[in-house]
Amino acid sequence: MKYEIKRGSSGAEKDTAIVWNEDETRFTSLVDSDDAAYWVDFELDAPIDDSFIMIPACAYNGNRFETVNRGYPPMFLESEMGVDVPVRMAPLPHLEPKGDSFMDVTTGDMATPCVCVLRKSMKQAFFVFFNQESHELNHGVTLEQTGDKLLIRLRAPSKRRLVYHMARMSVEPESDPPMSVKKGDEIVIEHRVFTLHCDSITELYRLFFEKRQVLYHGAPQANLPFSRYWELAEKRMQDHYIEKDGYYAIKAADDRFSKFSNWQAGWVGGGISTLPLMVEGSELSRKRSVDTLEFAGRTQSKAGWFYGIWAEGKIYYDDFEYYGERYSITMLRKHADLTYYMYRQIESLEAMGYEVPEFVKNSARRAADAMVTVWEKYGQFGQFINAETGEIVVGGSTAGGIVPAALCLAARYTGDKRYACVAEAAGELMYRTATQVGVTTGGPGEILQAPDSESSAALPVSYLELYEMNGDEKWLERAKEAAYQLSTWVVSYDYHFPKDTKFGKMGILATGSVWASVQNKHSAPGLCTISPIAYLKLYRYTADVNFLMIMRDIAHFIPQVASYPERPMLTNSGKPLPPSEICERVNLSDWEGRSEIGGNIGGSSVWPEITMMLTWLDIPGVYAVPSRGIVCASDHVNAWLDGGELFIQNTTDFDACVKVLIEDDEKMKRKLGAYWQDMFKRVSVPSGSTVHISANID
């Protein structure tokens, strides 16, 4: 793809010396200045209808969707409800679907500092990768569409015409402080450009993934072994249990301040935390987990739909109390999550030799039937459902991204081929409407249908379940494509937090954190709410080591931001989070204000804790394939192969029990199913020591 490149600076031409090569431009100030600016422009032909623009975690198809003015949390108006609706989002940085427009963002708004453009008719892609900052100020990135021309400007420092804060745009020049330079100071804007043949949007994501893995890396770190986190988490989870109603609440008793803190199906943890608790926990944890599944069945409508919220004997709907019983709204995603995890738990319990109550099995089947019924009526699942009637209130989206996986598990457990048929048909719909078009929406309940990572994270899981169910290679290929797209939400480098911020002082390394959405512009600890198991499965099926590396990055990040007695995470009030608790905020952007970059720890978000529990459950702390020379340490340990032995080193202050999985090509042919924890070896590695075990395959 052809492009023009230009360079410029503020002040007179004689004030700056400019030298460049293919990969960077160096500006040297020849004068003192209190308000210096430097930029590199790329201009290319990119007609709106023939282009796809992606900025990782920031813009998908340029965010060219309908915007509606809503305060947080935004909800659909009655006039916007319906089965076939356009994608809508609150005001945020975007290009317009038609006509000239611009969007100004900073490198703090991106999981990877990069802009990707696909010219569909030409089958050509343009990529420019760049650096985060100069003189401790983030670079700015402008996209400006004028007719068929697209201008991409990389600017040091950022200077936004409109600044984004929590579902609103405003003029705030003070949000972008000026850059002061002295004579002789150097400012570097990197710009690694690639123009490549590219047949499709899915191919664009593959090319991005490959470049991302080569160009960006994080530094190693270790502070809290997975096993130590698990000990703290299981203990704290007992404070979540409500004896009189028999369920694990979303929040602990000392932090239960609203209805949202009691029971929410799926999504942020209801009926999900119970999976690691029943498999890895004590007999008490297992019993209480089964009780919780029975409780979930009691919060199910006659039509089979799980109510979104339950507190103190009362049902609440997923509409922020706008409509109540008029529409009886429940999030499709909540219901689908809980169904998926219920079947995983049913299979796990039976694999461990425990009897599953018939009430739980019937509840799971009713939940699966409800999704089949809505599919048979509408040919889609929608985003919001009337829990009493099963009618779609708001359609479209990828909110049902995990539905094919849930129905695959239902089909495997019950033998009902109807579930398998709907799972496959639904997978085809997800592929056609989300993966192929490069945009997933509808995962969270409070961002309308802005693009998000949560719906993206569900698709590789569903496609892999379809592949394991019927063996059709197309589903493996689609799982790879969905995993490439998901990688755009995962931070690929160690963002430089300002040294005076909480995370700057703590030395938090951002690689592997996962962005929430283009509306809620923060990265977060892990995928909401699922382990990165899809990436392990993809490595086992494809031998692409890049899948292992991104799995490791996601898993490895989470314990960094967990609170524990020896290093509590302090909240905004100065009060420490209880041991094991985690706040979802990994603020790279200033969406909550410049003072909240690397901060704004308001309290426990719960779901990251459950994601870490799932990661301990699902992901081997050390994975090795000796015949290929592969060792991947996701846990907070070092590991290597030498002389037919696997060495594991623990540099943390805590003794570790490390789950180890050693495989060869033959072992990797095994399907993991819903329960694979019996495949792990557990290796004790005392603090400060190195142990070794045989790397031979059992």
Residue ranges: model-predicted function:
Residues 2-10, 181, 185, 198-263, ...:
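Low-complexity, Ser/Thr/Pro/Gly-enriched N-terminal "stalk/linker" regions
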Residues 17-24, 28-183:
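Beta-strand/loop-rich accessory regions of lumenal/periplasmic or secreted enzymes
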Residues 178-200, 686-696:
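Short Pro-Gly-centered flexible turn/kink motifs
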Residues 222-223, 278-293, 345-365, 408-424, ...:
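Structural helix-adjacent loops and short alpha-helical linkers that scaffold large soluble proteins
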Residues 261-280, 289, 326-348, 391-412, ...:
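Well-ordered alpha-helical segments within folded domains of soluble proteins
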Residues 286-337, 359-375, 379-383, 426-431, ...:
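Helix-terminus loop motifs that line ligand-binding clefts
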Residues 428-443, 470, 474-601, 619-638, ...:
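Non-catalytic carbohydrate-binding regions of carbohydrate-active enzymes
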Residues 637-698:
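C-terminal beta-sandwich/jelly-roll accessory domains of carbohydrate-active enzymes
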